Swiss-Prot record:
The keyword Transmembrane does not apply. Glycans are attached at N193. It is an enzyme of class 1 (oxidoreductase). It catalyses: [(1->4)-beta-D-glucosyl]n+m + reduced acceptor + O2 = 4-dehydro-beta-D-glucosyl-[(1->4)-beta-D-glucosyl]n-1 + [(1->4)-beta-D-glucosyl]m + acceptor + H2O. Residues 1-19 form the signal peptide. Cu(2+) binds at H20, H100, Y182. This is AA9 family lytic polysaccharide monooxygenase A. Lytic polysaccharide monooxygenase (LPMO) that depolymerizes polysaccharides via the oxidation of scissile alpha- or beta-(1-4)-glycosidic bonds, yielding C4 oxidation products. Catalysis by LPMOs requires the reduction of the active-site copper from Cu(II) to Cu(I) by a reducing agent and H(2)O(2) or O(2) as a cosubstrate. Shows C4-oxidative cleavage of amorphous cellulose and soluble cello-oligosaccharides. Also active on xyloglucan, mixed-linkage beta-glucan, and glucomannan. Not active on crystalline forms of cellulose. It comes from Schizophyllum commune (strain H4-8 / FGSC 9210). It is found in: Secreted. GO terms for molecular function: metal ion binding; monooxygenase activity. Binds 1 copper ion per subunit. O2 binds at H165. Keywords: Carbohydrate metabolism, Cellulose degradation, Copper, Disulfide bond, Glycoprotein, Metal-binding, Monooxygenase, Oxidoreductase, Polysaccharide degradation, Secreted, Signal.
Length: 247
């Protein structure tokens, strides 16, 4: 009986460990922009998370050798709604394991990706008692952000999931565990010419998150679960010129 129980737990762990995710493509004002993998999404080679907070992959979930411009860009204007569509292995599949509770955030940068400004953030909703990832799954893998009224030009959008199912301990203390970060960068061109330039004091990836950053270490499981209502999303506050987003 003990052996069977152990096998069941092991099977659950294996299934959970493989239930990773990345961005497939985006919509602009509800219109699908075509498959983005390696086209306008700087797609990572796998759907694996980034756990080392000092890794260059914290920027776009690609290593230095793959961090280059892909051939296309998505045209948007200030005030447009851009929706990201995540997937696991195939479009419209299970998106991500239901155990991977955590926040979803979006950052914006100039095309060089040197510094990043947070333009949307969603963590734990006390009204519905759900995490942003829970609602992402219910929404078929889609969440949205409103493009700020920035000057015309080329930009990067960095959508991010931080899965907390193993975040009870820091990765550098136990590399088997630690928060699982899923960043994904989409290339856009803003065609309108707004007046709200991105602030010069954005954060850097890697560097924005450390083990001491609130929201990186957080225990969501009993018997020592922390109250999710106290959860603080990692990183800076959302830019006050950003209209925000939704899941």
């Amino acid at each position: 009986m003990v052996r069977l129980a152990s096998l069941a737990v092991l099977g659950s762990v294996i299934a959970t460990a493989s239930a990773h995710t990345r961005v497939w493509g985006v919509y602009v004002n509800g219109e699908y922009q075509g498959d983005g993998i390696g086209q306008y999404v700087r797609s990572p080679p796998t759907n694996n998370p980034v756990k080392d907070l000092t890794s260059a992959a914290m920027k776009c979930n690609v290593n230095d050798a793959r961090e280059f411009e892909v051939p296309k860009r998505v045209s948007v204007a200030g005030g447009d709604e851009l929706s990201f569509e995540w997937y696991h292995d195939y479009r419209n599949d299970d998106i991500i394991a239901s155990s991977h509770h955590g926040p979803i955030q979006v950052y914006m940068s100039g095309d060089d990706g040197a510094t990043w400004t947070k333009i949307a953030s969603d963590g734990y909703d006390t009204g519905s008692s759900t995490w942003a990832v829970d609602r992402l799954i219910s929404a078929g893998g889609k969440h949205s952000v409103i493009i700020p009224d920035v000057p015309a030009g080329d930009y990067l959008l960095r959508a991010e999931i931080v899965a907390l199912h193993e975040a009870d301990v820091a990765y550098d203390q136990n590399p088997i565990r630690g928060a699982q970060n899923y960043p994904s960068c989409t290339q856009i061109t803003v065609t309108s010419n707004g007046s709200d330039a991105l602030p010069a004091d954005g954060v850097k990836f890697p560097g924005a998150y450390t083990d001491s950053t609130p929201g990186i270490i957080f225990n969501i499981w009993p018997p020592n679960a922390q109250d999710p209502a106290t959860y603080q999303v990692p990183g800076p506050a959302v830019w006050d010129k950003a209209p925000g987003g939704s899941v």
